[in-house]
């Protein structure tokens, strides 16, 4: 066992040869390197698989022995300062390593087909392998300096991958936004690291925790300064994990390729903030009020992310806000001191969200056959619908991921989210009410995404992409399916079916119109597949290739079974709670005397309540988004109910308000753009003016004045000796007069 730990330092460096060799090959042998590009993808998967096997071996030893191994090398040693580098292997490291490698392997296999037609194929795999190296280095770091170094490398990789298609202005702006927003948090992280080093004199986690606990117990530190340093450390996690108020970069990060979105949202960048707080939790729990602040940020993010996801039309942005909300649950759990629940939800959410993003990538891939390569169209749920019969495997997989995120048993996220919800009652009833309500919102918006994408009819077939605006065959209501003015900000939730040119029918009309099958052929195919004797074209979406379906199906298995790792049933000598053994010892401020086991009655009571709330959200989504032309045959009762309802106008205003809030991202981006961006630009303009007119103006003015004085003197003198003598005696006379008055 000791020998296995001794070689653990190699974990972050195994994927590193791929980007180095790709860069060297493109520099020296570009033609040969590009012709063998599939070989580089195979090497990426192979090396990451070796890391996964190594991490699994470490995890098995962690479960059996609960040991912690740390090895350090001294780099700088003197009387006043010492700096060491090393690696730390503990349960948190092993969990994160398995998470990064398993999701990373699935994404790499998926990307081989997804990016096969892209000219940046090799660049993509180089970035991905470097991303894995950076994240693995982060989770194995033994001190704050290493954390910060790999933290910045993760940020650089995310910048490169979000802006992978940098020729698109939207993608270029998105990566800049992510980079700048994270710089705010990273600067706070750096200041926090320096602050705690100034307090304790150490960067190493073990020494840092021990020294700081002694200082706190002896009351030898300034609590206000310590709290400030802790908040600065937490600012790094706020930015990286897209917590309020530094969450604004996350939806724009969807401009990168879909496999990148899966990796960022499941196991790498956004998980880094959760990892940092979990790693520093022994430090935070002894600082007054910082845990309350962490839980407050978490609960705000939980609710804000859920409300912003309600009216998104872009399938990836809807999933992005879902990630933001779920990360809020993890941060809430850490703030409550429920270490196990937070990591449990990190694991289950990672696999479920990776499944959803890869499934959305499969949908986008199939939609591109109809609308061409245009993310605004291929990712727009307004143009989807009716994909069940075209992509049945993707549909089933996406449904399982959706139900998991909704908290439906026995899928993965049910077990972890339920644990956080139950712990929230012990911490704060107000936080608990918000968390449980958001669980219903989660079920609503996830079911909405599923219904708009897969149910009903294929809406893109009723659009005209010849460059002319054409009235669609029907419009789709309630924050997803709309008419021809898709980007109209004044769009309201008027639920109409537009028939022909002038005819209109109510959403609640009992007439069901049959769609002419001839209309399905009005779209010309945009994608043709060469390399065959005859050109094959598609007029319908089609299921993805096996290379893309294989990772999706593997993630389905994870979504089905990974939740059983943390089932807290330890009764009659049967120990099912593998996760608790894995995380021994762990921090739990809410159950200090508990052995992480509960009885069946208590569990079933809480589970029924949470499933009821989720089911209610699913029911509302089905009621609002289930296609009327395929479900409702007789709606006279609903029509009569709507006609006699005196509060319909008021309810429409509420719906429109919710829509505007979600569509405009809670007006937070607008606030930043209006006050921060404009203010900074005005400050920059003032600094430019001050620099040019004042700083440069003073020496330039002195030089210019000297020039004019010299010219005046030169013109007066004229080169005549009599003039020089006149000025000489004049100055001498003035000097003598001044001397006389000063001395007498």
Curated annotation (Swiss-Prot):
InterPro entries noted in UniProt: NADH_UbQ_OxRdtase_chlpt_su5_C, NADHpl_OxRdtase_5_subgr, ND/Mrp_TM, NU5C-like, Proton_antipo_N
Transmembrane segments: 9-29, 40-60, 89-109, 125-145, 147-167, 185-205, 219-239, 258-278, 290-312, 327-347, 354-374, 396-416, 425-445, 549-569, 608-628, 724-744
Keywords noted in UniProt: Chloroplast, Membrane, NAD, NADP, Plastid, Plastoquinone, Quinone, Thylakoid, Translocase, Transmembrane, Transmembrane helix, Transport
Entry GO MF terms: NADH dehydrogenase (ubiquinone) activity; quinone binding
One GO term (biological process): ATP synthesis coupled electron transport
Any Pfam family hit: Proton_antipo_C
Catalyses which reaction(s): a plastoquinone + NADH + (n+1) H(+)(in) = a plastoquinol + NAD(+) + n H(+)(out); a plastoquinone + NADPH + (n+1) H(+)(in) = a plastoquinol + NADP(+) + n H(+)(out)
GO cellular component, one term: chloroplast thylakoid membrane
Major subcellular site: plastid
Membrane topology listed for this record: Multi-pass membrane protein
Compartment annotation: Plastid, Chloroplast thylakoid membrane
PANTHER family, per the entry: NADH-UBIQUINONE OXIDOREDUCTASE CHAIN 5 (PTHR42829:SF2)
Subunit structure: NDH is composed of at least 16 different subunits, 5 of which are encoded in the nucleus.
Similarity remark: Belongs to the complex I subunit 5 family.
UniProt name for this protein: NAD(P)H-quinone oxidoreductase subunit 5, chloroplastic
Source organism per UniProt: Adenocaulon himalaicum (Trailplant)
């Amino acid at each position: 066992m000791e020998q296995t730990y001794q070689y653990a330092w190699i974990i972050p460096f195994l994927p590193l040869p791929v980007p180095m060799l790709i860069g060297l090959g493109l520099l020296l042998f570009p033609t040969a390197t590009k012709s063998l590009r599939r070989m580089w993808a195979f090497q990426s998967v192979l090396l990451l698989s070796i890391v996964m096997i190594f991490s699994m071996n470490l995890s098995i030893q962690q479960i059996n022995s609960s040991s912690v191994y740390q090895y350090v090398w001294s780099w700088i040693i003197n009387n006043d300062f010492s700096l060491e580098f090393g690696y730390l292997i503990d349960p948190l490291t092993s969990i994160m390593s398995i998470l990064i490698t398993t999701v990373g392997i699935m994404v790499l296999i998926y990307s081989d087909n997804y990016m096969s037609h892209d000219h940046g194929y090799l660049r993509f795999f180089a970035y991905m392998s470097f991303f894995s190296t950076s994240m693995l280095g982060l989770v194995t770091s033994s001190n704050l300096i290493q954390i910060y170094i790999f933290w910045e490398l993760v940020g650089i990789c995310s910048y490169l991958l979000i802006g992978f298609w940098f020729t698109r202005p939207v993608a270029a702006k998105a990566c800049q936004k992510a980079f700048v927003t994270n710089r705010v948090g990273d600067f706070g992280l750096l200041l926090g690291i320096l602050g705690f080093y100034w307090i304790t004199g150490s960067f190493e986690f073990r020494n840092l925790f021990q020294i700081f606990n002694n200082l706190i117990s002896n009351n030898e530190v300034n609590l206000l300064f310590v709290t400030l340093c802790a908040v600065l450390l937490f600012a790094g996690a706020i930015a990286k994990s897209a917590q309020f108020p530094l969450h604004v970069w996350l939806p724009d990060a969807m401009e990168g390729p879909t496999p990148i979105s899966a990796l960022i949202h499941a196991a790498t960048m956004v998980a880094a903030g959760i990892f940092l707080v979990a790693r520093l939790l022994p430090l935070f729990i002894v600082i007054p009020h910082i845990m309350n602040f962490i839980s407050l940020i978490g609960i705000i993010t939980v609710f804000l992310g859920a409300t912003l996801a309600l009216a998104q039309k872009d399938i990836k942005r809807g999933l992005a806000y879902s990630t933001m909300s779920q990360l809020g649950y993890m941060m809430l759990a850490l703030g409550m001191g429920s270490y196990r629940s937070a990591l449990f939800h990190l694991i289950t959410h990672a696999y479920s969200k990776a499944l959803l993003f890869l499934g959305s990538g499969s949908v986008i891939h199939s939609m591109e056959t109809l609308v061409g390569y245009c993310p605004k169209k291929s990712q727009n749920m307004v143009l989807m619908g009716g994909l069940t019969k075209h992509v049945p495997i993707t549909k089933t997989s996406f449904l399982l991921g959706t139900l998991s995120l909704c908290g439906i048993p026995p899928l993965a996220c049910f077990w972890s989210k339920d644990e956080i919800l139950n712990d929230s009652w012990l911490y704060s009833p107000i936080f608990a009410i918000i968390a449980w309500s958001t669980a219903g919102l989660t079920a609503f918006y996830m079911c909405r995404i599923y219904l708009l994408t897969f149910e009903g009819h294929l809406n893109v077939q009723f659009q005209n992409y010849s460059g002319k605006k054409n009235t669609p065959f029907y419009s789709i209501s309630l924050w997803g399916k709309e008419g021809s003015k898709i980007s109209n900000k004044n769009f309201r939730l008027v639920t109409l079916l537009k028939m022909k040119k002038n005819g209109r029918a109510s959403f609640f009309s009992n007439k069901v119109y049959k769609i002419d099958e001839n209309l399905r052929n009005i779209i010309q195919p945009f994608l043709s597949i060469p390399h065959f004797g005859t050109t094959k074209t598609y007029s319908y979406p089609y299921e993805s290739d096996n290379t893309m379906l294989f990772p999706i199906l593997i993630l389905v298995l994870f979504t089905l079974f990974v939740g059983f790792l943390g089932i807290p049933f330890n009764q009659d000598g049967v120990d099912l709670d593998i996760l608790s053994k894995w995380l021994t010892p762990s921090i739990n401020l809410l159950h200090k005397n508990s052995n992480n086991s509960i009885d069946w009655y208590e569990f079933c009571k809480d589970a029924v309540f949470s499933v009821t709330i989720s089911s209610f959200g699913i029911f509302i989504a089905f009621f609002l988004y289930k296609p009327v032309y395929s479900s409702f045959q007789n709606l006279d009762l609903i029509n009569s109910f709507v006609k006699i309802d005196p509060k319909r106008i008021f309810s429409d205003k509420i719906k429109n308000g919710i829509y505007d809030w979600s569509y405009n991202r809670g007006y937070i981006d607008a606030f930043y753009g209006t006050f921060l961006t404009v203010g900074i630009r005005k400050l920059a303009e003032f600094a430019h003016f001050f620099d040019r007119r004042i700083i440069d103006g003073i020496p330039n003015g002195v030089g210019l004045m000297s020039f004019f004085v010299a010219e005046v003197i030169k013109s007066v003198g004229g080169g005549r000796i009599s003039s020089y003598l006149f000025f000489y005696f004049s100055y001498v006379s003035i000097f003598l007069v001044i001397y006389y008055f000063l001395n007498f």
